[in-house]
Amino acid sequence: MVVDFKIKRAPAYRVASVSWKGPWNERRIRAQFDRVAKWARKTGLRTGKWIFREPGTRAWEVSIEVRGSAHSEGPIRMRMLPATSVASVVFDPNVVSPAVVYHGVTDWLRWRKRDKTIRSVGAYREVYDGDPWREPKVWAHTEVQVVVRK
């Protein structure tokens, strides 16, 4: 499998999201994604990309892109993730270790900063085309995006 890094323009996403602080817990991440997906189904919204972010130290956010009219309700907040330039890499976690991919993209971005292709690096996020736990094809097409400033 080829793992290739590229800089591209990511579209704006209108998302329903839940955020919290605490230690890394994959079971909690999955439960929060399920909570947002259940809310979207109950509200009658069509869903798109599933986005997982770490906006701060030990701070986590799960978001699902929604299409349709909705308002925040309880812990679920409606947000707009703006269109931005990102460094992107698509890979299959069953073939290539995510630790290797994250290390590789970090080094690749360090060199892009040195050769002045980019000015700064922002937050990392994982973007899926659907539910990565229930759909193996979605899991095999994991995309890691890193917000960059040119």
Residue ranges with predicted function:
Residues 1-150:
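A solvent-exposed interaction/effector surface
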